[in-house]
């Protein structure tokens, strides 16, 4: 047999069967992949779903009109757009109406549309349907030339190639389907989280997956349940493939003599009736011991499957068997496979977010062009009306003297330089529009159109304006379809929380001028008497020195606030532990600082209670207060804590609790100002603040204290190592923004002020850092109390300049402690 030989008498082309099968199978495969089984990455719909929604749109079945028989909808879909079996189309319609299948239903069904027990829907002649508000948003603006239309199967009608889709349907509702040689399994998600992620990507196009995971916690199934472990979620979002364990949500009820396990939520796509039957069979066959009865008490209020246990049965053991042997625990495979540019592709989460944003930008640009052309056309006609109204007498006379409408039209065009469209509009104008009121309406409409045209042109010319429209519409969708998370996400039950393995102990965390950070056990620093030489707290580079330190427990959350007003989170135990003399690790390896960014304040907290706030103090005397709860979110790039004036920078930040009454600001030249806390009200993160102190020339803020009682004591330290304790009441209160009073008497002997701290608890030690990296620990009670205008006593005998001071918990006196010699102080 010769390939491709033509029998001219019979007009038959002979081909090899192998090549024919190969070509036919490839054509069939692509038809199934592109035209049937996989969703589009932009609107998240398979062709059958898209055709159903478009057919309902053409029938006018909005969410506000009466329901129409499902058979009518299916008939329109089959006859006009989808020449396949009616059962396949009806099944697709039914699924879009099931609240246990869709996170956001696209069809509002009336009648029996099936159940989570696997019951089939009633026949299409009995059920009725219409669109939901969500599907209306998917089709919104379709009549404004926003998408391309293609011929239907018999080339008699047009159907949409894609839908505008204002909402991210692919990620919100997910998708599943089996094609030829490939399959997709995209889980549903919570609308609020996806919208927040889209807005973040819109504002930060280079955002990484770590930032997106702050918004998208994971899948959110319509049936609830619990996802265990985040590793599979992260892997799926990173590569497009992953697996997650999903468990039913249960609770245990106790009666007088036994326990009852109640199943409240199901794993996604689990048949409840089959699960109940499966549990009953396992109990009857003694594969699971301890179950006396299983019954389904579910109703319209929700799912309730009751598993009664025998008297001696332990619920924890029974539950472990149920998870192992039944579909109370399932594995959901995530495959982010979708169609884009007529080709199937596995996407990452970030790619899907970018694709949807690009789709929305394209839709908005096309809609804007459509509205712009429409507005221009209307404005063109109104310009003709205004010309006619300004010359009404002449126009009436010209029309009266014309022999025909055509002649009148030509005369108007020639006399007033009008277009043909304008001339026709004038000739068709009603006489009532010649009244003064109608004239004003025309002028007002024309003016509004000019403003609209200018606005639409602005959207087309400005990327920022376009992004603003996308963001506004996304937030509108979020507000309209916001709902609580249904699926709980927990750490894997196979993993142990790392914090459980780390002792919660006090640590000294130090940071050098060049940004090297470390933590050292507090016990490594022995207490010395006042006037001691100190111990070396860490080695540094020749031109580096330790400039900041603080004491916190290993489980605490550290808040790093930079000179640029950015705030970063970090657990204390994530800072590498080192010896006293070690240099530490560069902070840029732990948090993502900008090249010109420097840590200026570090605070520790155990939680983000809204009963506390953060007070920020800048070098130029600005103070600001923001509720601590606003800083709970954490981003790799940090979050904005304060907006700074040009040339200003942050110098200090403090935690303010409910007992705080005053704030005190101290300057380099020893000037203090104390004012009521209520004079600094709480404001948002992205704001500037108010003036706290008016500074003299060459002066700047070096520290601040939160005061809860006038009996509080303040400890001031100068750069030459002198210090004193003073009662807070010694500083008279003023109004915020004043010039302040002398807080410490400064001389050439004392040097300028380095800092001021609160020392209400005498069971504290003072730790002092010098420029050469020496640290001395002194008991607070050894520093005598003096008036505000005193210079204080010598705290450290060294020629070094004091750089920073802070307090730390008192250490127990070691037994048989000997005084160290000068030679051993640096060992």
From Swiss-Prot:
Motif residue range(s): GyrA-box: 528-534
GO MF, one annotated term: DNA negative supercoiling activity
Isomerase as a keyword of this entry, yes or no, is yes
User: Is this entry keyworded Transmembrane?
Assistant: no
Main localization, broad class: cytoplasm
Task: Give the PROSITE patterns listed for this entry.
Answer: TOPO_IIA (PS52040)
Please give the Pfam families that the UniProt record associates with this protein. Answer: DNA_gyraseA_C, DNA_topoisoIV
Which keywords are on file for this protein?
ATP-binding, Cytoplasm, DNA-binding, Isomerase, Nucleotide-binding, Topoisomerase
- Listed GO CC annotations: chromosome; cytoplasm; DNA topoisomerase type II (double strand cut, ATP-hydrolyzing) complex
Indicate the enzyme's highest-level EC class.
isomerase
The Swiss-Prot or TrEMBL record describes its family as follows: Belongs to the type II topoisomerase GyrA/ParC subunit family.
Per UniProt, subunit arrangement is: Heterotetramer, composed of two GyrA and two GyrB chains. In the heterotetramer, GyrA contains the active site tyrosine that forms a transient covalent intermediate with DNA, while GyrB binds cofactors and catalyzes ATP hydrolysis.
The record's function comment reads: A type II topoisomerase that negatively supercoils closed circular double-stranded (ds) DNA in an ATP-dependent manner to modulate DNA topology and maintain chromosomes in an underwound state. Negative supercoiling favors strand separation, and DNA replication, transcription, recombination and repair, all of which involve strand separation. Also able to catalyze the interconversion of other topological isomers of dsDNA rings, including catenanes and knotted rings. Type II topoisomerases break and join 2 DNA strands simultaneously in an ATP-dependent manner.
Record protein name field: DNA gyrase subunit A
The gene behind this protein is gyrA
């Amino acid at each position: 047999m010769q390939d491709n030989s033509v029998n001219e008498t019979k007009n038959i082309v002979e081909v090899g069967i192998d090549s024919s099968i190969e070509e036919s199978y490839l054509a069939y495969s692509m038809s199934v992949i592109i035209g049937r089984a996989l969703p589009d990455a932009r609107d998240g719909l398979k062709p059958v779903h898209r055709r159903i929604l478009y057919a309902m749109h053409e029938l006018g079945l909005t969410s506000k009109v009466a329901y129409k028989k499902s058979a009518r909808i299916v008939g329109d879909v089959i006859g006009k757009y989808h020449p396949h079996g009616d059962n396949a189309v009806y099944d697709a319609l039914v699924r879009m109406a099931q609240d246990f299948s869709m996170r956001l239903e696209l069809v509002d069904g009336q009648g029996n549309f099936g159940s989570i027990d696997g019951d089939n829907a009633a026949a299409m002649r009995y059920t009725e349907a219409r669109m939901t508000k969500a599907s209306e948003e998917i089709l919104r603006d379709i009549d404004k030339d926003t998408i391309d239309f293609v011929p239907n199967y018999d080339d008699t009608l047009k159907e949409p190639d894609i839908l505008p889709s204002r909402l991210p349907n692919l990620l919100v509702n997910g998708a599943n389907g089996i094609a030829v040689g490939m399959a997709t399994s995209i889980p549903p998600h919570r609308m609020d989280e996806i919208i927040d992620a889209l807005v973040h990507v819109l504002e930060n196009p280079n955002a990484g997956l770590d930032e997106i995971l702050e918004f998208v916690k994971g899948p959110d199934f319509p049936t609830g349940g619990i996802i265990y472990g985040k590793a599979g979620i992260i892997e799926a979002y990173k590569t497009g493939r992953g697996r997650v364990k999903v468990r039913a949500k249960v609770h245990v009820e106790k009666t007088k003599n036994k326990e009852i396990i109640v199943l409240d939520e199901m794993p996604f796509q689990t048949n409840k009736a089959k699960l109940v039957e499966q549990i009953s069979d396992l109990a009857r066959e003694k594969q699971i011991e301890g179950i006396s009865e299983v019954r389904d008490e579910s109703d319209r209020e929700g799912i309730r499957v009751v598993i009664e246990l025998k008297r001696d049965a332990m619920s924890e053991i029974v539950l472990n068997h149920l998870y192992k042997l039944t579909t109370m625990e399932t594995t959901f495979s995530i495959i982010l496979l979708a169609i884009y540019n007529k080709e199937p592709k596995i996407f990452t989460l970030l790619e899907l977010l970018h694709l949807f944003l690009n789709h929305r930008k394209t839709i908005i640009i096309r809609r804007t062009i459509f509205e712009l052309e429409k507005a221009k056309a209307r404005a063109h006609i109104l310009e003709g009306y205004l010309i006619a109204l300004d010359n009404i007498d002449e126009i009436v006379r010209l029309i009266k003297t014309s022999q025909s409408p055509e002649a009148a039209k030509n005369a108007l065009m020639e006399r007033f330089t009008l277009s043909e469209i304008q001339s026709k509009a004038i000739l068709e104008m009603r006489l009532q529009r010649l009244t003064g009121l109608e004239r004003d309406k025309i002028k007002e409409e024309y003016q509004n159109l000019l403003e609209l045209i200018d606005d639409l042109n602005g959207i087309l010319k400005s990327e920022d304006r376009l992004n603003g429209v996308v963001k506004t519409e996304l937030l509108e969708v979020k507000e309209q379809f916001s709902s609580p998370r249904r699926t709980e996400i927990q750490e894997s039950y196979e993993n142990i929380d790392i914090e459980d393995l780390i002792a919660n102990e006090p640590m000294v965390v130090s940071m050098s001028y060049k940004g090297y950070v470390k933590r050292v056990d507090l016990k490594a620093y022995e207490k010395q008497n006042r006037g001691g030489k100190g111990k070396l707290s860490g080695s540094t580079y020749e031109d580096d020195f330790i400039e900041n330190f603080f004491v916190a427990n290993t489980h605490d959350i550290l808040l790093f606030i930079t000179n640029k007003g950015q705030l970063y989170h970090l657990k204390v135990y994530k800072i590498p532990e080192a010896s006293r003399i070690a240099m530490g690790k560069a902070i840029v390896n732990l948090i993502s600082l900008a090249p010109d960014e420097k840590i200026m304040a570090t605070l520790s907290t155990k939680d983000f209670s809204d009963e506390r706030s953060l007070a920020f103090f800048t070098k130029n005397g600005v103070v600001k207060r923001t509720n601590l709860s606003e800083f709970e979110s954490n981003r790799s790039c940090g979050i904005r804590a304060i907006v700074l004036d040009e040339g200003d920078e942050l110098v200090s930040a403090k935690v303010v609790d409910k007992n705080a009454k005053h704030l005190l600001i101290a300057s380099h030249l020893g000037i203090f100002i104390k004012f009521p806390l209520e004079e600094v009200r709480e404001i948002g993160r992205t704001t500037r603040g108010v003036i706290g102190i008016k500074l003299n020339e060459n002066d700047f803020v070096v520290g601040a204290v939160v005061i809860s009682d006038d009996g509080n004591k303040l400890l001031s330290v100068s750069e030459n190592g002198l210090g004193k304790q003073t009662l807070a009441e010694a500083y008279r209160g003023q109004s915020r923004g004043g010039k302040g009073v002398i807080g410490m008497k400064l001389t050439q002997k004392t040097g300028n002020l380095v800092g001021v701290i609160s020392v209400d608890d005498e069971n504290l030690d003072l730790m002092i850092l010098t420029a050469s990296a020496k640290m001395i620990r002194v008991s607070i009670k050894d520093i005598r109390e003096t008036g505000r205008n005193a210079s204080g006593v010598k705290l450290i005998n060294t020629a070094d300049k004091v750089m920073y001071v802070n307090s730390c918990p008192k250490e127990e006196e070691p037994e048989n402690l000997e005084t160290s010699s000068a030679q051993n102080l640096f060992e």
